Amino acid sequence: MGQKINPLGFRLGTTQSHRSFWFAQPKNYSKGLQEDEKIRDCIKNYVQKHMRISSGFEGIARIDIKKRIDLIQVIIHIGFANMLIEGRARGIEELQTNVQKSFHSVNRRLNIAIARVPRPYGQPNILAEYIALQLKNRVSFRKAMKKAIELAEQADAKGIQVQIAGRLNGNEIARVEWIREGRVPLQTIRVKIDHCSYPVRTIYGVLGIKIWIFLDEE
């Protein structure tokens, strides 16, 4: 059987950079990792509760975390203008307070910044979220996949592969379906490939969505 390496980890240091940037002693490493997960979960939960946009999903592309001794800098990359964007400083302050409460750090300040992603549908997380929303609304999985590919092509992606696994359309037997458009050269390290794995809960059970997008060649 073919062993599939994660395309993001495979390209770290060439076309991909770390989503968390900090240094720690080996004994404190796990604590720092858990803290990062807590921050990301807290932000996603807050956005889901308070800041739904018209299309029905929050549209977070990724969350980068940089840590210093006295400061935690969090950069939220979002695809669509919502309450967190310019002119809504109160929303950011409220989110900052909410996250600060969740991990009780007295010595370090938390600073949250927002960055806008120019082509949202070129981001696999946003595309996966779009497909998840369609599947929850009982749209056919093939239709959802084709629409996601159209959106990625409009965002100038050179290639895209979408895979959905689980009880598709409510079938008794789980299976894996995938569709590819354009080139997705997973073995070439110099090409910039973005990837995400996204679980979605439907009335038939949990489905797994995986997306690979070929963005650019270095």
UniProtKB/Swiss-Prot annotation:
<dbReference type="GO" id="GO:0006412">
    <property type="term" value="P:translation"/>
</dbReference>
<dbReference type="InterPro" id="IPR005704">
    <property type="entry name" value="Ribosomal_uS3_bac-typ"/>
</dbReference>
<keyword id="KW-0687">Ribonucleoprotein</keyword>
<dbReference type="Pfam" id="PF00189">
    <property type="entry name" value="Ribosomal_S3_C"/>
</dbReference>
<dbReference type="InterPro" id="IPR015946">
    <property type="entry name" value="KH_dom-like_a/b"/>
</dbReference>
<dbReference type="GO" id="GO:0019843">
    <property type="term" value="F:rRNA binding"/>
</dbReference>
<dbReference type="InterPro" id="IPR018280">
    <property type="entry name" value="Ribosomal_uS3_CS"/>
</dbReference>
<keyword id="KW-0694">RNA-binding</keyword>
<dbReference type="InterPro" id="IPR036419">
    <property type="entry name" value="Ribosomal_S3_C_sf"/>
</dbReference>
<dbReference type="InterPro" id="IPR004044">
    <property type="entry name" value="KH_dom_type_2"/>
</dbReference>
<keyword id="KW-0699">rRNA-binding</keyword>
<dbReference type="InterPro" id="IPR001351">
    <property type="entry name" value="Ribosomal_uS3_C"/>
</dbReference>
<keyword id="KW-0689">Ribosomal protein</keyword>
<dbReference type="GO" id="GO:0009507">
    <property type="term" value="C:chloroplast"/>
</dbReference>
<keyword id="KW-0150">Chloroplast</keyword>
<dbReference type="InterPro" id="IPR009019">
    <property type="entry name" value="KH_sf_prok-type"/>
</dbReference>
<keyword id="KW-0934">Plastid</keyword>
<feature type="domain" description="KH type-2">
    <location>
        <begin position="47"/>
        <end position="118"/>
    </location>
</feature>
<comment type="similarity">
    <text>Belongs to the universal ribosomal protein uS3 family.</text>
</comment>
<dbReference type="GO" id="GO:0003735">
    <property type="term" value="F:structural constituent of ribosome"/>
</dbReference>
<dbReference type="GO" id="GO:0022627">
    <property type="term" value="C:cytosolic small ribosomal subunit"/>
</dbReference>
<protein>
    <recommendedName>
        <fullName>Small ribosomal subunit protein uS3c</fullName>
    </recommendedName>
</protein>
<comment type="subunit">
    <text>Part of the 30S ribosomal subunit.</text>
</comment>
